[in-house]
């Protein structure tokens, strides 16, 4: 406790978390609960009424209802029905959101406290589609982010391994296509069995992951099997779910490449500017700190632009896209801890980002959700670079980091853009910003 009182980074985190908590305590009281947010709540409600997943539901994202059922049960126990259910679920989301902020900060702070503070703030103001409710987007992003933090920090204790397993189970329940993430980690573990490059991928740790997975997987299997008529019927239902006509029926690669092409086309001016700055820093080593600072400012500028002019086009999901490219630049420039940065800080969230194209009918807008963990880890990469490559000037008798100042300005602009969008945007209410004038 004394360490928390003495450390200015700890105090900065607490102040930021308090501000974000107060902001959302105000914000969750406003905005309509239409379309997705209200629909999410029908699944756990029906489960409590006796329906079974994969038998009585048709959509790809239904498995999230299994995670929401305890919350709906608590709602019914405390209030006897569904009165106030939307507001109460938003409160559940806020509690979980703050918990993820705190846990991620505590884990990252042991690597870089300044980076941990900045990453926690970026995560705190990032909400997929502005949907402040426990759903397959919000819980999926939280799971991927914590997985990235745990692996990036090389956490391999029993508790960390069990938590990794639970998070993998949550991730797959939020998005079944995230079995690709699980398969990717198993592939890495298999390669590690021959090369021995990562201790946290050793067999004993992988076995503990599966104990964590079983915590959710076994109750889920019991729930599904007690409601199905036969195994063949269950398999047929699963097949029909993946052929859901409400979602794009084209091939997996077609959906992914279409979204990628659209992303590149919509941001071609940003990408051109980024390429010039990045290549300049790559070719001339001594100006890399300056170029990285300018890249961070460029990312923040485009986030501010999207917040001002495209708030109802991308639902605020694009604000963290630009930091994905900033993260890649910091990773390449840094050269230290490249394996952890690339594999867990960047590749893991990017793989999740691609799976969102397959599970959602929102295309690029859904894909952009996956850039939230990338952005948070990217901020951490920036901090790691500053620590390893300080670029300072004399100011008032003290050495001041020029790159640090540039990154601080970029962070302030990034947080300002995200705060503005979170305060103004209401999901699916493109023409009715007055929805924020009425309480829930």
Residue ranges and their predicted role:
Residues 29-43, 52-71, 79, 83, ...:
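Extracytoplasmic catalytic/substrate-binding loops of multi-pass membrane glycan-assembly enzymes
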Residues 91-113:
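Transmembrane-helix motifs of polytopic, lipid-linked glycan transferases
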Residues 110-114, 144-163, 195-198, 331-339:
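Membrane-interface transmembrane helices that cradle and orient dolichyl/undecaprenyl
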Residues 127-128, 148-150, 160-178, 182-188, ...:
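Membrane-interface alpha helices of multi-pass inner-membrane proteins
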Residues 132-141:
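Short acidic/glycine- and proline-prone juxtamembrane loop motifs at membrane-interface regions
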Residues 150-171, 200-211, 289, 343-347:
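Short hydrophobic alpha-helices at membrane interfaces in multi-pass membrane enzymes
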Residues 168, 181-217, 283:
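Perimembrane helix-loop-helix junctions
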Residues 205-282:
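Membrane-lumen/periplasm interface segments of specific transmembrane helices
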């Amino acid at each position: 406790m004394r360490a928390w009182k003495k450390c200015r980074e700890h105090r900065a985190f607490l102040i930021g978390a308090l501000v974000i908590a107060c902001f959302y305590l105000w914000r969750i009281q406003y905005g309509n609960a239409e379309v997705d947010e209200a629909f999410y709540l029908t699944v756990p409600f029906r489960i409590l009424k006796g329906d079974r997943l994969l038998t009585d539901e048709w959509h790809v994202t239904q498995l999230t209802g299994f995670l929401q059922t305890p919350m709906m049960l608590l709602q019914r126990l405390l209030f006897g029905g569904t009165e106030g259910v939307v507001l109460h679920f938003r409160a559940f989301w806020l509690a979980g959101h703050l918990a993820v902020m705190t846990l991620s900060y505590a884990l990252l702070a042991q690597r870089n406290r300044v980076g941990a503070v900045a990453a926690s703030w970026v995560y705190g103001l990032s909400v997929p589609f502005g949907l402040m409710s426990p759903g397959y987007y919000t819980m999926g992003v939280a799971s991927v982010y914590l997985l990235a933090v745990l692996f990036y920090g090389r956490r391999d204790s029993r508790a960390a391994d069990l938590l990794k397993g639970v998070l993998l189970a949550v991730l797959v329940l939020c998005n079944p296509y995230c079995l690709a993430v699980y398969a990717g980690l198993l592939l890495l573990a298999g390669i590690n069995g021959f090369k021995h490059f990562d201790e946290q991928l050793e067999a004993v740790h992988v076995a503990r992951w599966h104990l964590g997975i079983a915590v959710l997987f076994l109750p889920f299997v019991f729930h599904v099997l007690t409601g199905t008529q036969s195994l063949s019927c269950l398999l047929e239902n699963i097949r029909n779910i993946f052929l859901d006509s409400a979602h794009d029926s084209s091939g997996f690669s077609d959906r992914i490449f279409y979204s990628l092409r659209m992303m590149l086309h919509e941001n071609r001016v940003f990408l051109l500017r980024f390429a010039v700055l990045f290549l300049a820093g790559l070719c001339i080593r001594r100006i890399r700190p300056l170029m990285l600072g300018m890249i961070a400012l460029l990312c923040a500028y485009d986030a501010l632009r999207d917040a001002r002019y495209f708030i109802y086009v991308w639902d605020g999901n694009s604000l963290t896209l630009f930091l994905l490219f900033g993260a890649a630049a910091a990773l390449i420039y840094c050269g230290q801890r490249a394996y952890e940065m690339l594999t867990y800080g960047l590749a893991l969230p990017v793989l999740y980002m691609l799976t969102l194209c397959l599970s959602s009918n929102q295309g690029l807008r859904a894909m952009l959700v996956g850039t939230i963990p990338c952005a948070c880890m990217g901020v951490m990469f920036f901090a790691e670079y500053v620590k390893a490559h300080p670029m300072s000037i004399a100011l008032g008798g003290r050495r001041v980091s020029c790159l640090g100042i540039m990154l601080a300005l970029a962070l302030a602009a990034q947080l300002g853009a995200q705060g503005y969008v979170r305060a103004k945007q209401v999901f699916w209410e493109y023409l009715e910003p007055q929805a924020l004038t009425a309480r829930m």
